[in-house]
Amino acid sequence: MDKFQSKFTRFGFISICFGSIALVLLISHCSTSFFDYSFQKFKFSFPEETELRRNVYTSSSGEENRVVVDSRHVSQQILTVRSTNSTLQSKPEKLNRRNLVEQGLAKARASILEASSNVNTTLFKSDLPNSEIYRNPSALYRSYLEMEKRFKVYVYEEGEPPLVHDGPCKSVYAVEGRFITEMEKRRTKFRTYDPNQAYVYFLPFSVTWLVRYLYEGNSDAKPLKTFVSDYIRLVSTNHPFWNRTNGADHFMLTCHDWGPLTSQANRDLFNTSIRVMCNANSSEGFNPTKDVTLPEIKLYGGEVDHKLRLSKTLSASPRPYLGFFAGGVHGPVRPILLKHWKQRDLDMPVYEYLPKHLNYYDFMRSSKFCFCPSGYEVASPRVIEAIYSECIPVILSVNFVLPFTDVLRWETFSVLVDVSEIPRLKEILMSISNEKYEWLKSNLRYVRRHFELNDPPQRFDAFHLTLHSIWLRRLNLKLT
C-alpha cells in the first residue's frame, strides 16, 4: 500500500508539473495576443521632436518674434497636443484624407481647364445668362460646380465673441460680419468640422470689432496686432495646420480700412496667407495672385437702402444728369475731382457736402454715370451703390484691385478713367455713344446679383463669389 501510494504521489506530482507548464504557455500566448491587438488598435502618430522645434510666433510686444521650443519642454508639448488638439488622428488616416484633398484639387483643375476651351453656352445659360460680363463663363461655371462639390472650410473654434466668431452686420463694414455669421451659423454646406477634410482654414476674428474694443483714441494699431499675433500663435500651437504650410491655406477676412495694417501682425499672414479685404490697395502690399478683394456693401438695418432695391421704377428712372458725386475731400484723388468739377457744370453735379434738402440716392438714380474716386483708402461702398442704382460706375482710383476681377470683365459694366484724365472727364463721358451706354446699363442689371448679400445666401451672390475667389486662390488657377 505504501509502495502504491508512493508511485501515485510521484505520478500526481509529475502531472501537476506538466499541467502548470501548459497553463503558463497558454496564458503567455493569450497575453501576447491581447497586447499585440492593443498596440495595433491604439497606435497614434505623435509629433517628432524636430517638428516640435519648428518656429512659432508670439507677440508679447505687439511685433513678431520667433521662439524655439526648448527640448526640455518636448514631453510637455506632446501632452498638450494630445490633450487639447482634437485633430490628432492615426497617421494613415491623416495621410489618406490629405491625399484626397490634393487629389480633389488636381481633378478640379483638370476639369476647369478642359471647360475653359468649351464655347457651348447652353451648359451654363440658365445660371450665367449674360456671358459678356465674364472673362470665361464656361470655366467659371465649371469652377463653381467644382467648388460646390468639393470645397470645405474649417473655422477655428478658438477665441470668444465679440472679437472672434462675430462681426458687424450693419453699416459700411457689414459684409465682414455677414460672412463670419454665415460661416458660424452652420448653415453653409461649405463648413467642415473635420480639419483634415478642409481645403482652407478660416481665422474668424473681426478687425472691425478689434478696432472698436481694443483701439484707444490717438494711439496706434499695436493692440490689434498683438491680438492677431497671439491668436495665430494659439491656433498654431493647438493644431498642426498653420505650421504645415506657413499659413498658405489659411485666410482672414475684413472690410475695415485697417485690415492691411492688422495683417502685418504676422509675417506669414501678410506674405503667405489669403487676405480677403475691402481695402485692396496694391501699393500697400495687396497681392491679387493670393489675396481677394471683398466688395464693400453698406447695409442699413441689415438691408440696402429702399431706394436701391431692385424694382421696375428703378430701371425706368429718368437720367437727366450726365454724372454725379458727393463726398468729403480726402485722399489723393478727390481733391483733383473737386478742383476741376465742383459746381462747374450743371450736367455733372459734384458736391463736397450734399445739401441737407437733397437726397444722395435720388441723385444716383437720376444720373447716367456715378463718379467713384478713392478717398484715404481705395475702397468705397459707392461702387456697389452705383451698381444697385444702375448708374454706370466711373472708377477714379490708383492701385485699386476691383472685386471679382478674376471672373468679371469690369469694362463691360463700368468706365475706367485714369486719374490724369479727370480734367477731360465730361469729354470722355460725352464720347460714349447711347448704344454703348445702354449696353453698359444692361450689363449692370446682370452683374448686380454678384454684389448682393442675401439671407440666406443664394448661388452666385456676393457670399458665394467671395468663397469662389478663395477657392481659386487655393486652386492657384486663373480663369482667362
From Swiss-Prot:
GO molecular function, one term: glycosyltransferase activity
Glycosylation sites: N85, N120, N243, N271, N281
Keyword annotations from UniProtKB, A to Z: Cell wall biogenesis/degradation, Glycoprotein, Glycosyltransferase, Golgi apparatus, Membrane, Signal-anchor, Transferase, Transmembrane, Transmembrane helix
Highest taxon of the lineage: Eukaryota
Pfam annotation, one family: Exostosin_GT47
Keyword rRNA processing: no
One GO cellular component term noted in the UniProt record for this chain: Golgi membrane
Keyword Repeat tagged: no
Cytoplasmic topological intervals: 1-10
Entry's transmembrane regions: 11-31
InterPro entries referenced in this protein's UniProt entry, alphabetically: Exostosin, Exostosin_GT47
Disruption phenotype: No visible phenotype.
A biological process term (GO) from this entry: protein glycosylation
Lumenal side: 32-480
Membrane topology: Single-pass type II membrane protein
Subcellular location: Golgi apparatus membrane
Stretches of the chain forming a coiled coil according to its record: none
Catalytic activity, EC: 2.4.-.-
Role, per record: May be involved in cell wall biosynthesis.
Family: Belongs to the glycosyltransferase 47 family.
Descriptive protein name: Probable glycosyltransferase At5g25310
Source species of the chain: Arabidopsis thaliana
